[in-house]
Amino acid sequence: WRFCMSSESINLGMAGSRKRRIKDKLAKYGVTTGGALVLVALLLIFFYLLYVVKPIFNGATMEPTASFTLPVAGKTAWLGVEEQNEIGYRFSDKGQVNFFAVQGDGKVKVGQVLGQAQVKGDITAVAPPAPGQKLIAYGFADGKAQVVQPYFKVSYPNDVRVIEPSLQSPFGEAPVVVDPQGKALTLMVFEATKDKMATAAVTADGRGVMAVMSGEENFLSGDIEWSAQNYSIPSLPRHVDQMLLTPNLRILFVREGNRLSVYDIHNLNDISLRDVMEINAPNANVTRVELLSGASSLLVGNDNGVISQWFEVARDGKRQFTQIRDFKGDGAVAQLTPEHFRKGFISADKEGTVSFFHATGETKLLSEKVEGGALSALAISPRHNVLLMQQGDAFKLFAVENEHPEVTWSALWQQVWYEGYPEPQYVWQSTSASNDFEAKLSLVPLVFGTLKASFYAMVFAVPLGVAGAIYTAYFMSAGLRKYVKPTVEIMAALPTVILGFLAGLWLAPIIEGALPGVVLLLILLPMGMLLTALIWNYLPERGKSWLPEGWHAILLIPG
């Protein structure tokens, strides 16, 4: 009988060992497979992130898409493309306006004329708009000016989008009197805000004049009623080559050769000459000056190909325009076109070489020669992905790929001198409230902030963790330890990303609903622990005997 029992025990033990080995092998292969899959998943995540991030560092490209001619007359004063990249427009120095297709379909061909208009009057001057603006002003021989803009009406007949171009006069059909003496306007500049517009001009007899129109809403009709006032610009240079006006109507720039005069027009009753600067590069002459998007910086093009950026810097309690950085082009700057909503710009030399730059990144993104000679006009679309240029009678379209010009290694890891800052700095500001400011992408503050936060977290976490581990190992009872130890190990095994995800989605709303209590917890919890220890110390031995040795930690749970 004993022999039979022994045989049965051996058989049961062998069967149990066989099952155990099978389970061990399954567990071994399962853990190995799971670990390998985790590594594969991490590698896939890494390569996917690399695939997503890589285009940020791609360079700019431009590819020709179309070429056409238009029945135009006069010199091109302003060339542009509407927001949908479907219609282009050209304003001449004689007031002729042409609308044409820049995208073709079965009904419309690229370059097909979609409409024409004419600004009436004896035109003697024209003021193209600043980057991102759509208002253009024409000056007349009688000292008046007319402000017009291209308008694109969008309709959906039969569920098909149709864009109809036209010419509008947003401030009324009647011209504005810029010079009360009625002299011809030979050079002018124009800018407007929501409730004010200003026109500065040079008259035929060399005077500097300015007209400012203020708008007020009629509370009965709801229409905007405009009233104009005229002012004089003192100390105007004898030979004015160019004028610029900031969109906030605070600063007027007047260029005479290589010299730039800066006028403070914030107080129109006391227009004053604030500064006179020599802005040319060494051994070069200025060919063109433009405002960068946001109108906080000046771009100065020279005949040696150098383009310099200037903006105001606070020095000795005063704000002075300072040369910040230079860009080297390929030849004498003939065209200088800022982008609409970014700190980039495009230049073209007399040989037809087109170059893309980004001002803050201090980078030259692309340089490509366009066959056909010098460009007479150059425009970039509001989406920055279509380039329109004119060479003689020919108009050319290019598809531009330039998604992230602001992202460079220097912008990420080096000090950058941003507009409005007194010196180069490490700055992180991913978004901004308006186009006047730009994203600041330095990773240095993020890295140091992360390291600093980790250090201060470890200052508190390391002593608490080590002390908790010592207490759990040497003082806590075995019955309580078997619950605490696995719980802590599971928490340690959870990725911090998961913990952050739970904290953001689940814990944050709970804390928000009890925020005063959570803040008081930081004060009351240490006090409660000390008070509990004090009370426990003064309890008699008979009162302490109800709690077994090593279970004292549960007294803190109610707290």
Regions flagged by a language model, labelled:
Residues 22-53:
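Hydrophobic alpha-helical transmembrane signal-anchor segments
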Residues 94-100, 142-149, 157, 205-214, ...:
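Structural motif
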